C-alpha cells in the first residue's frame, strides 16, 4: 500500500513546491529574476527601441498638430504654442525615462503585495499534507480492496500535478508580460506626443499597472487557499477507505481549482476592479 501513499504524497509535494515558488516569484524583482540575465536582454531591446520611439515621437507630434490646428495662425497663438511645446517635452520625457516610470509602478505594487502579506501574517504558504487518517486507512486495506484505491489515487495525482503546473505557468506568464511591456514601452509611449493618439500611451501605462496588480490578486488567492490548507477536508473515519480517499481528493481538488481559477482570472479581476 506504500505505492498509493507515495503517489499522493508526491503529487502534494509537487503542489507545495509550486505554491512556494509562487510566493518567491511574487516578491522577486524582474531585475534579479533568473540571475538578471533576462533583464539585461530586455534593457538592450528597450535601448534599441528608444531611437525608434523618438522618431515616432516626431511623427505623432506632427500628426497631432495637423489634426488639432486648422491653420498656421492657431500654432502661432502663445497658449497653443506652449501647449504643443509642453506636450512634446512630456512625451519625450516618457520615452527617455519610461524605464524609471515602469520600475516605479512595479515598486509601488510590490509595496502593496508586501503590505498584504505582512497584514495577513504570512510569508510562506501553508503546506498541504495527507491526513494521518487516510494513511492509516490505506495501510490497513487488503489487496483486492486496494485496486479501486489505485485508480482513485492515480486520477487524483494526475489532476493535482496538472493543476500545479497550470498555476505556476500563469505566474511565469505574468513575469514575461512585464518583460514584454518594458522592452517595447518606447513605441506606445511615443503616442503621447499627439493629442489624437495620446490615449494609446495612457492605455499602455494603465495596462502595465494592471499586469503588476495581478500579483496582488494572486497573493490574496494564495492567502485564502492557505487558510483552506490549514484546515484540511474533514475525513470520515467510519467510511470505507475508497470512500474516504475519494471524498478527500474530491474536496482537495475543488479547493485547488478555486485557487488556480482565481490565478488564471487575475487579469480579468484587475480589469473589472480598476476599469482598465
Where does each model-flagged region fall?
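Alpha-helical transmembrane spans of integral membrane proteins, capturing the lipid-embedded, hydrophobic core
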Residues: 56, 60, 64, 84, ...
Amino acid at each position: 500500500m506504500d505505492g498509493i501513499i507515495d503517489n499522493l504524497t508526491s503529487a502534494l509535494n509537487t503542489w507545495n513546491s509550486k505554491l512556494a515558488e509562487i510566493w518567491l516569484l511574487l516578491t522577486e524583482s524582474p531585475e534579479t529574476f533568473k540571475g538578471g540575465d533576462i533583464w539585461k536582454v530586455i534593457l538592450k531591446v528597450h535601448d534599441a527601441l528608444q531611437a525608434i520611439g523618438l522618431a515616432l515621437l516626431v511623427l505623432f507630434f506632427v500628426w497631432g498638430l495637423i489634426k488639432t490646428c486648422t491653420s498656421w495662425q492657431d500654432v502661432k497663438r502663445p497658449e497653443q504654442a506652449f501647449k504643443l511645446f509642453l506636450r512634446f517635452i512630456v512625451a519625450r520625457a516618457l520615452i527617455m525615462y519610461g524605464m524609471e516610470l515602469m520600475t516605479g509602478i512595479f515598486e509601488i505594487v510590490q509595496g502593496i503585495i508586501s503590505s498584504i502579506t505582512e497584514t495577513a501574517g504570512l510569508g510562506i504558504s501553508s503546506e498541504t499534507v495527507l491526513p494521518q487518517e487516510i494513511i492509516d486507512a490505506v495501510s490497513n486495506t487488503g489487496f483486492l480492496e486496494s485496486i479501486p484505491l489505485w485508480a482513485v489515487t492515480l486520477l487524483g495525482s494526475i489532476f493535482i500535478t496538472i493543476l500545479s503546473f497550470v498555476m505556476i505557468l500563469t505566474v511565469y506568464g505574468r513575469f514575461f508580460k512585464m518583460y514584454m511591456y518594458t522592452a517595447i514601452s518606447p513605441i506606445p509611449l511615443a503616442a503621447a506626443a499627439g493629442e489624437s493618439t495620446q490615449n494609446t500611451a495612457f492605455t499602455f501605462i494603465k495596462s502595465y499597472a494592471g499586469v503588476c496588480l495581478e500579483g496582488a490578486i494572486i497573493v490574496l488567492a494564495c492567502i485564502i487557499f492557505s487558510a483552506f490548507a490549514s484546515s484540511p477536508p474533514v475525513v470520515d473515519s467510519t467510511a470505507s477507505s475508497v470512500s474516504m480517499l475519494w471524498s478527500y481528493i474530491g474536496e482537495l481538488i475543488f479547493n485547488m481549482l478555486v485557487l488556480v481559477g482565481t490565478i488564471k482570472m487575475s487579469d480579468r479581476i484587475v480589469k473589472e476592479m480598476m476599469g482598465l
